[in-house]
Amino acid sequence: MRMIGRGGAYVPTGDSSVAGTEGFVGNVLTSDPVRYVRNAAIMEQEPSLGLGAPTVAWADAAMRQMNQFAEHSYSASIRQPILMVAAGRDEVVSTPAIETFGQNLLAGRHLILAGSKHEILQEQDQYRAQFWAAFDAFVPGTPRF
C-alpha cells in the first residue's frame, strides 16, 4: 500500500482511536493504576497527545529497521555507549529481541526489568527506581538524590 501512495493509511483494523484510554484492567502499558488513570484522563482531555494505530508507512519502516537490527553485524558495529532498558512483561515490543540486540553491543549495556510492562517510566515506583539506578550508574556526573 505504501508503494501505491497509501502509506498514510492506518494498518488493517487500525484507526485513530487513542491507545491507553480504555480501562486499566488488561492494559499492556503499565501495572501502576494511578499513573495509568492519570494518563488516560490527560489523553481524553487532549487527544492530540495520544497515539492511534500505526500507519502503513510507519509499519513498513519499522519492519525494515527490525530486519537491520536483527543482523548481528549491525549491533556489533555500534561504538557509542548505549544503555538499553527493557520491560520483562512487555506485550508491545519483543523483550527477547531487545536482549539479543543488547548482548551484541560492544560499548553498550542492557537491562531487563522483570515485572515491568512497556511504559517503564509510567510504572510502579519499584521499576522506576531500577531504571533510574541504571541510568545514574551509566551517565557520568549524574547527581545522586
What feature does the model see in each segment?
Residues 1-50:
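Alpha/beta-hydrolase-fold enzymes
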Residues 80, 94-103:
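Short alpha-helix in the alpha/beta-hydrolase fold that links the catalytic acid
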